[in-house]
């Protein structure tokens, strides 16, 4: 995707991978005792704390501001980061993440951990696997795609039409991933 290539089957195959992984490692499929043994086997306490704190509490790069944006931008960012309501919502999400083990998640499911061509998809780096809510992996990749769509405003394209088409493709991936996930699950 770093080369602005369109992968026609990415949403379908990514959703199929997640839906199958989530369904077959949940109590929707497994007997309760087997499911609990699976969760115990994949407790992964060391890497789980990285996700619990890194994603929900310690915002990566939050103290790094581009001086070219000016002090007003830095103050604006800090007002969001330290907003008590937002902080409370982050703690609520973290609690849900920590206490609602519904399935084994990939834990780091984003486009850099997916190898794809026009017809095949392979997923790597499952070292963060542990029990968590169904929605985590899908939310993680959707956030990654939104970030990529935003970054396209500063990346070089041969034409503005090409840029707009690629951003539209990325936005369509979000809806397709969700729709296919629900369909396959």
Language model feature labels by segment:
Residues 37-42, 111-114, 150:
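Flexible loop/turn segments at secondary-structure boundaries
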Residues 19-22, 47, 178, 182:
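Structural signal for well-ordered, non-membrane alpha-helices
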Residues 2-13, 17, 27-106:
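ATP-dependent phospho-/nucleotidyl transfer catalytic cores
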Residues 2-6, 123-130, 160-162:
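Short helix/strand-bridging catalytic loops that position acidic/His residues to coordinate divalent metals
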Residues 88-136:
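Active-site acidic catalytic loop and adjacent metal/ATP-binding pocket
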Residues 135-185:
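Active-site activation/catalytic loop segments of kinase-like enzymes and analogous catalytic loops
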Residues 1-7, 23-27, 147, 151, ...:
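A glycine-centered beta->alpha junction motif in the catalytic cores
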Residues 14-22, 142:
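Short amphipathic C-terminal alpha-helix that caps PH/PH-like domains
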């Amino acid at each position: 995707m770093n080369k602005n290539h369109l992968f026609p089957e990415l949403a379908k195959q990514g959703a199929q991978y997640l839906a199958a992984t989530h369904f077959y490692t949940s109590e929707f499929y497994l007997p309760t005792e087997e499911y609990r043994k699976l969760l115990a086997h994949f407790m992964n306490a060391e890497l789980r704390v990285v996700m619990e704190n890194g994603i929900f509490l310690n915002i990566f790069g939050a103290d790094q501001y581009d001086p070219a944006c000016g002090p007003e931008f830095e103050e604006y960012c800090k007002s969001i980061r330290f907003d008590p309501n937002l902080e409370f919502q982050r703690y609520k999400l973290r609690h849900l993440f920590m206490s609602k083990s519904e399935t084994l998640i990939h834990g780091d499911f984003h486009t850099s951990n997916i190898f794809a061509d026009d017809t095949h998809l392979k997923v790597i780096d499952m070292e963060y696997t542990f029990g968590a809510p169904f929605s985590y992996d899908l939310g993680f990749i959707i956030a990654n795609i939104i970030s990529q769509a935003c970054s396209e405003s500063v990346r070089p394209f041969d034409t503005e039409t090409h840029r707009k088409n690629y951003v539209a493709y990325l936005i369509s991936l979000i809806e397709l991933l969700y729709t296919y996930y629900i369909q396959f699950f």
